[in-house]
A protein has these predicted regions:
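Glycine/serine-rich loop-strand microenvironments at binding/catalytic pocket rims
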Residues: 1-9, 59-63, 69, 94, ...
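A short helix->loop->beta-strand "cap" motif at the edges of active sites that frequently abuts
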Residues: 94-112
Length: 194
């Protein structure tokens, strides 16, 4: 299961995300008994509770998380976070540290120079977040211009995640704490549906 988090304005990327995961599962992953299942807020079942918490519960069931930002930050979800995407990203980091999620991929869509010269509060929040990510040096993110660039970069991630799954299936993986190439994440590896 692969979660996508993004504020509004990135509907094309969200659509591309779901289409790519479905196509990649059929063409590349399915023959290896692996399915990449897309998960987003659109898939969250309506119910009683704080809406963002219901979305968070879906994120907690995922193996990977993908975040995409452009010129909007989103709306506050409560007193702690200034947007749903920020809350989802914080939760994904917590899940990663607890070895409950295997990886986080972060993408930034390029912003026109004219907008960067006079950013409103939404874009300012995105730029501050990006600056923090750059300063902390904990993520190698991808910047892209067109939706097709995002899809191409995401496909590379899927190929990498599929390779990791194969290594896990053979008993030697970055996800295996006893493997020579151990990473900060430990566990038995992703489920056949990732």
């Amino acid at each position: 299961r692969v979660f996508i988090g993004s504020p509004g304005g990135l509907e094309e990327e969200r659509r591309s995300f779901k289409q790519l995961l479905d196509r990649y599962s059929i063409v590349h992953a399915g023959p290896h008994d692996v399915m990449f299942h897309p998960v987003g807020w659109e898939d969250t079942t309506a119910g009683v509770g704080r809406p963002q918490e219901l979305i968070n519960e879906d994120l907690k069931q995922c193996d990977y998380a993908v975040f995409v930002l452009h010129d909007r930050w989103g709306s506050p979800t409560g007193p702690t976070y200034s947007s749903g995407t920020e809350e989802e990203f914080a939760l994904a980091e917590e899940l990663y540290r607890a070895a409950k999620i295997y990886n986080i991929a972060l993408f930034f869509k390029d912003v026109d120079k004219s907008k960067r010269n006079d950013p409103g509060p939404q874009l300012k929040a995105v730029l501050e977040f990006k600056r923090r990510i750059e300063d902390e040096k904990r993520y190698l993110f991808r910047q892209y211009v067109h939706s097709a660039d995002f899809t191409d970069a995401l496909e590379v991630h899927l190929a990498s995640w599929l390779r990791d799954h194969h290594k896990t299936a053979r008993g030697s993986s970055m996800l295996d704490p006893v493997a020579e190439t151990a990473s900060p994440i430990s566990g038995a590896g992703p489920s056949p549906t990732v």
